Amino acid sequence: MDEEIDTRKINNSFLRDHNYATEADIISTVEFNPTGELLATGDKGGRVVVFQREQESKSQPHRRGEYNVYSTFQSHEPEFDYLKSLEIEEKINKIRWLPRQNAAYFPLSTNDKTVKLWKISERDKRPEGYNLKDEEGRIRDPTTITTLRVPVLRPMDLMVEATPRRIFSNAHTYHINSISVNSDYETYMSTDDLRINLWNLEITNRSFNIVDIKPANMEELTEVITAAEFHPNQCNTFVYSSSKGSIRLCDMRTSALCDNHSKLFEEPEDPSNRSFFSEIISSISDVKFSHSGRYLMTRDYLTVKVWDINMESKPLETYQVHDYLRSKLCSLYENDCIFDKFECVWNGTDSVLMTGSYNNFFRMFDRNTKRDVTLEASRENSKPRAILKPRKVCIGGKRRKDEISVDSLDFSKKILHTAWHPNENIIAVAATNNLYIFQDKVN
């Protein structure tokens, strides 16, 4: 990341775009695979679209950062729970990738109730010359077979297939909000509002409940789990966040049921800032370990915070994402925007944070220089390979030509889901039904 973050040049291209978005087309999750060669999106229609990065060519070196559609498949279908008389949406809540072990790719996808492990593989050859079947696959008349043939493989057009390998279901009473693959690559956890389950990737009919915060009397319920993630290299450690603004770090070596946390990260509330909305805006919508495992990043409604896992008392850093909305919390409560769940991501070196905002704005914070920038992902000012200009929001009556008034912000345009390439300065931003890819300008 360049030090001059607010003047850095960024190329962009949008890959998936419709003039008129239907509810099913709205992107609900974005995730790079561990190498960054693939990028997956899930939408409210239960579909997963996988993009593959262009291979570098000497004739067109500028195309190296571009991603093209690699595979599209229907991951989840709408279902109905007849016992509870509830519809189960097909919306993809999260996608996570397993590290590549062979020629195939293995993503995990989940809706509210069911997690699926998919295998994405390529075929560029097909068998020919069977003895008992013709080329169309029909059984041949044995009386017409006069010679014994040896089947051979013939080249064919490349075909990418997505097939479900495992289906993990019937383990969650409440809606799944996150999944996280363990660093042992043998297990993963799925999290709903009140419980966290640990699964073995090879076993679909049994999971272990490792966190259960459901009270005996549901009237005594005071908080719910909002997100959870495994430590990047300690397979026994994970964290989960709550709607009360706390983060709990748990060690599975201490007990099978991790209801008693090892560490509790919580910032004391400032009594002078106490208001009707305090509890709502302090709810954590996302928690992410840094790649090094030393830090935690959390996102609440107005801020991004960085925590040192060795210091529980207060965050190491606090970044204001859109503090200008503090005076508008009442109207944001009335239109339900105050309950929006924004995600946050680290760059590959843990030096820059990124998260979304309204009006199709997204924010970047450089931890080293303490500089920040607001950028916009929109069709109006984003043509392929265009350079993004920083945007500014003003609160007062007077505003400059390049500024936008807080009263002019479009709260229906919001960036909730973002992803950062694990090794390079390439980011993916989901704006309603559009997917934008941005990268540092090379020349």
Curated annotation (Swiss-Prot):
Keywords: Cytoplasm, Cytoskeleton, Membrane, Repeat, WD repeat. GO terms for cellular component: cytoplasm; cytoskeleton; membrane; protein phosphatase type 2A complex. Disulfide bonds: none annotated. It holds the Pfam family WD40. InterPro entries: PP2A_PR55 (IPR000009), PP2A_PR55_CS (IPR018067), WD40/YVTN_repeat-like_dom_sf (IPR015943), WD40_repeat_dom_sf (IPR036322), WD40_rpt (IPR001680). Its main location: cytoplasm. It is found in: Cytoplasm; Cytoplasm, Cytoskeleton; Membrane. Gene3D superfamilies: YVTN repeat-like/Quinoprotein amine dehydrogenase. PROSITE patterns: PR55_1 (PS01024), PR55_2 (PS01025), WD_REPEATS_1 (PS00678). GO terms for molecular function: protein phosphatase regulator activity. It comes from the Eukaryota. WD repeats lie at residues 22-61, 87-128, 171-209, 220-260, 279-317, 334-375, 410-443. Belongs to the phosphatase 2A regulatory subunit B family. PANTHER family: PROTEIN PHOSPHATASE PP2A REGULATORY SUBUNIT B. PP2A consists of a common heterodimeric core enzyme, composed of a 36 kDa catalytic subunit (subunit C) and a 65 kDa constant regulatory subunit (PR65 or subunit A), that associates with a variety of regulatory subunits. The B regulatory subunit might modulate substrate selectivity and catalytic activity, and might also direct the localization of the catalytic enzyme to a particular subcellular compartment. This is Serine/threonine-protein phosphatase 2A 55 kDa regulatory subunit B beta isoform. It comes from Carassius auratus. The lineage of its organism: Eukaryota, Metazoa, Chordata, Craniata, Vertebrata.
